A protein has these predicted regions:
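Residue-level signal for well-ordered alpha-helical segments
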Residues: 5, 11-15, 26, 35-37, ...
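Short alpha-helical interface elements
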Residues: 33-34, 42-44, 48, 59-63, ...
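Glutamate identity and glutamate-enriched acidic tracts
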Residues: 2, 6, 10, 15, ...
């Protein structure tokens, strides 16, 4: 990461940088991009250069963007990022604005969650048909139920990677059931996962 930061410093002379994604939380591997928001004078741009064998996903914004009105929803990806440079305090203010926005986001009502969980059981019955459509619905259910699980737990959903890590950390038994449903692809494993979903709704 040091060489990447050196490259960004030399090229953009930034006043702020927020690293987010896998390089911020330590989950990166050899295939990971380096996600970073750079605050630097000049025009807005995207840098996808390869530095030290790592592909950059660097979004460069002039500080003027954050001095006026902007939509924090456009920057939610940095909510748990690491501020590695902030000479004028703009990066800290940006992250605080994003966190305030996320705190104010409404969660689904429990009635809505119950309807979604009922949809999961209904969808499970449609996976029994044994044809291409049935298998499509099976995959669809496994994907969509992760979002519904987050709603049931009263978590905001920030993509599968963060959702799975949070589930593994806070609900390891449910994580094991979901992983089994994904890997085994059997009706019994699917039922076990949906049982966890219903349990979360009632907790």
């Amino acid at each position: 990461m040091e060489k990447i930061l050196e490259y960004l410093m030399e090229k953009y002379q930034p006043e702020g940088m927020i690293v987010y994604g896998s390089f911020a939380d330590g989950s990166y591997n050899e295939n990971s991009d380096f996600d970073v928001l750079v605050i630097a004078s000049g025009e807005k741009r995207h840098d996808a250069s390869v530095v030290d064998g790592t592909v950059l996903d660097a979004f460069v914004y002039p500080p003027e963007i954050f001095a006026g009105a902007f939509d924090p929803a456009d920057f939610v990806q940095i909510f748990d990022g690491k501020i590695v440079l902030d000479s004028k305090g703009v990066a800290a203010k940006l992250r605080a604005r994003v966190l305030a926005y996320l705190d104010a986001l409404p969660l689904k009502s429990m009635d809505e969650v119950r309807q979604d969980v009922a949809w999961c059981r209904k969808m499970q019955s449609r996976t029994l048909r044994g044809d291409a459509e049935g298998f499509y619905r099976w995959h669809w259910l496994l994907t969509e139920s992760l979002l519904i699980y987050c709603d049931a737990r009263r978590w905001h959903y920030f993509g599968p990677k963060k959702a799975l890590r949070q589930m593994q950390r806070e609900q390891p038994g449910h994580f094991a059931a979901y992983r089994t449903a994904l890997e085994d692809f059997t009706q019994s494993a699917l039922s076990g996962w949906l049982d966890c979903l219903e349990e979360s709704m009632d907790s």
